[in-house]
Amino acid sequence: MSVKRFVCAAVLAACCGMAVPARAADTIETGLIGAANAVEWPMYIGLHKGFFTDAGIKPDVIYVPTAPGLVQQLAAGSLDVCDIGVVEPIHAVARGASVGILRISGAVSPYAIIAKSDIKTIKDIKGHTFVIGGLVDINRVYLERVLKAAGLKDADIDITVAGSTSARFAALKSGSADVTMLAPPVNFFAEAAGFHSIGNMIDYTKDLPFGSTDVSRAFAEKHKDAVLRFVSALDKAYAWFNNDANRDGAIDILVDEMKNSKRDDVAKSYDFLRKIGFFPTDGTISKKHVEALMDEMTAIGDTNGKVPMDTLIIAGVSKVGP
């Protein structure tokens, strides 16, 4: 049917009291890490509050165990978008993968450094096993900052890997690790289980972004309008979270998503994430902060140098600032 005919038909249908068929929502395969968690709060808000539905978007949420696995599926086209540590799209682009950053999803690190009772300070981690998310992910960059602050080197600790916050907590409980970094509300679960915090990662990494929402370039080029609507819905979800009037509603949403979480722990998570300004409302990609992160990655041999910013962003979609 031509546009003119469709408009005429719509007008006639309206006059006759007939319903006009709604446009089908665009499905976007959306990858998240591990299982439901506080870092993905805006995604759940967008789903529960209807922001995606209003934008004509239907996210098909798929959980993947590890960060490298997520970005591999994004690069392969199995996923359309994903939310992950900022180092992952940098790694992918450096290897020639056709992916890009849509927005910053986590402005700063949300991690608490959680340890067994005999470890009192970060200097006490010497000789202990520290479990992180991956040897080439955002956890590794953050760990390097902690080691420097403690006057330690890699050789002073044993480093093991568990892909998600819940997996790292499991390693701590099993005794296979002595210290780790956990995002809320899992850090509060750990404290209730007898472990304790020896510091917040933000104290060592204020200048380094944590997470980004990323997209397959092939998908973005073919479905630019859908991607713009997806980002717009996400922006609304971030703004909704950052409105204190929505505190109770936000807590209800994450309790529902995480199923077995205690409301008090989720409430603590909301207050903590609001306090540190974790969720950026506009998602602007700071060139200065991303380049600082790439400097850290280069310093530990994670990359061979900086990736040009124009290869990391999606022109006409990503917001980029100084």
Give the predicted meaning of each segment.
Residues 1-3:
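N-terminal secretory signal peptides that target proteins for export/translocation
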Residues 8-18:
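Bacterial N-terminal signal peptides
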Residues 18-24:
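Sec/Tat signal peptide C-region and signal peptidase I cleavage site
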Residues 24-154, 159-162, 166-171, 178-184, ...:
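Short, glycine-/small- and polar/acidic-enriched structural segments
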Residues 87-88, 166-258:
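Pocket-lining segment of extracytoplasmic ligand-binding domains
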Residues 127, 192, 314:
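Phosphate-coordinating loops and pocket residues in cytosolic domains that bind phosphorylated ligands
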Residues 221-303:
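Secondary-structure end/capping motifs
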Residues 291-322:
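Conserved C-terminal helix/tail region of periplasmic/extracytoplasmic solute-binding proteins
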